[in-house]
Amino acid sequence: MQIYKVGGAVRDRLLGRPVTDIDWVVVGASSDEMLARGYRPVGADFPVFLHPQSGEEYALARTERKSGRGYGGFTFHASPEVTLEEDLTRRDLTINAMAEDEQGRVIDPYGGQADLEARLLRHVSPAFAEDPLRVLRVARFAARYAGLGFRVAAETLALMRQLAESGELQALTPERSWKEISRALMEPNPEVFIQVLHDCGALAELIPEVEALFGVPQPAAHHPEIDTGVHVLSVLQQCARHRQPLSVRWACLLHDLGKGLTSEADWPRHIAHEARGVPLIDAVNQRFRVPRECQELARLVGEYHTHAHRALELRPNTLLELLQSFDVYRRPQRFEEFVAASEMDARGRLGLEQRDYPQAAYLLGAAQAARAVSVKPLVEKGLKGAELGEALKRARLAALKAYKEERGKA
């Protein structure tokens, strides 16, 4: 029985990065032997055990064989006869197919160390093309390690393109796809994730609404980068630089979907693209069963982001309607995230990344002014029901008028 550290822990140590999770593989042991040593079984599909002291996962060495569609269409075989090399060959990338023995020696049968040096994300074997989830995983690793100079090997990108064309991506469950997408959007370079999916044809299969933005021009005066797809990539880059949460990053990815529906005859203008985009945003949200808070923010950002850009010009009653659309009185954080997403949109433009965005402070100040209006005096006057609601609305409108006048003087 031999125990090896495998996968990400070995990779990240060699890269000089912090090692968080450690996975272990056990060669030459059976399930009965693991149980006899006090390990607790947790694997439903194949033998995985928790260490009795550390709680870390130990998996019996196994092989896998394609037996159906999708990432779940595999038959696994675990036995004491399975070698370490056989276990490593089923892994996706060479940099993830290394092991370390108990003396700290690296076992690297597929050239993972050489690919680390060359900064290449390369598949281990042609079996890579059997698992559609690997398309998303490789794109996610590209987003994680882009800052270190990593790129997807040409032959691996070709296999990813083959998978995209095969229709296998459609076999991925919404939950599994969302798990990979959401993790990738939180990587240091989320725009690289989308770019890689675009380059291999997978974006057209998974989120065709975003794919449709590439090649769609915008007015150069407002968008020096011109291409809407490139703009979305730039906005995601700004999200990462400003450490925005997942909800903001997801909203930014989808905020301009309506531009993909603009007739070529109307290019480069995109009048009413906000409203046109809302049904598309809803469709993408439903496709991946996105968490509610991400769904709601994406929809609102898509519909109202140009309101944010014109915030200083909005009349008090329009500003009040905007605040009410976000239920800013009960959910102030959602409005703050909307403002953040709008600012990322404004900064995600070639050469304008550092420009001021006074609309952010103005909108947050307006929300504060409206929320400062107390309902208590109105209740004490005996107002209730619809009458109370109208009085409260008038009071908030007055507060916003005063706020706008005061800001105008400043």
UniProtKB/Swiss-Prot annotation:
SUPFAM superfamilies: Nucleotidyltransferase, Poly A polymerase C-terminal region-like. The keyword Hydrolase applies. Residues 228-329 form the HD domain. Mg(2+) binds at residues 21, 23. Keywords: ATP-binding, Hydrolase, Magnesium, Metal-binding, Multifunctional enzyme, Nickel, Nucleotide-binding, Nucleotidyltransferase, RNA repair, RNA-binding, Transferase, tRNA processing. GO terms for molecular function: ATP binding; CCA tRNA nucleotidyltransferase activity; CCACCA tRNA nucleotidyltransferase activity; cyclic-nucleotide phosphodiesterase activity; magnesium ion binding; phosphatase activity; tRNA binding. GO terms for biological process: RNA repair; tRNA 3'-terminal CCA addition; tRNA surveillance. Its cofactor is Mg(2+); Ni(2+). Belongs to the tRNA nucleotidyltransferase/poly(A) polymerase family. Bacterial CCA-adding enzyme type 1 subfamily. Monomer. Can also form homodimers and oligomers. Comprises two domains: an N-terminal domain containing the nucleotidyltransferase activity and a C-terminal HD domain associated with both phosphodiesterase and phosphatase activities. A single active site specifically recognizes both ATP and CTP and is responsible for their addition. This is Multifunctional CCA protein.
